[in-house]
Amino acid sequence: MALPRKNRLTTKKDIDNVFKRGRTVKGSFLFIKGFNNQRGYSRFAFIVPSKYVSLAVDRNKIKRILSEEIVKTLLLGSGYDTIVVIYKKIERGRFKELREELKETLLKIPNS
């Protein structure tokens, strides 16, 4: 299931704002930048660099896995702008570990 349009960070201005103002939490595969957006609903962006995941098919699969986990855990109403960035190479067999990694890392984001 895809993220609803209102829950996506789409403009460069919004993404740059999160990188400037957001707090960073690191996991073993990914890091998350996020801050309180005062909107009442959360918006997300997923960045998977080709440096770490070379095939576009795999990059898209990772983005789908991450977005499905966000929708499944119903984190859409908490009021955060959040960017999830992959920063280490991931082999195909380890994509499922991303779900757990995302859950654990999201819980570490401090409320501000």
Question: Where are the predicted features?
Answer:
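Positively charged, solvent-exposed patches that mediate nucleic-acid binding
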Residues: M1-S112
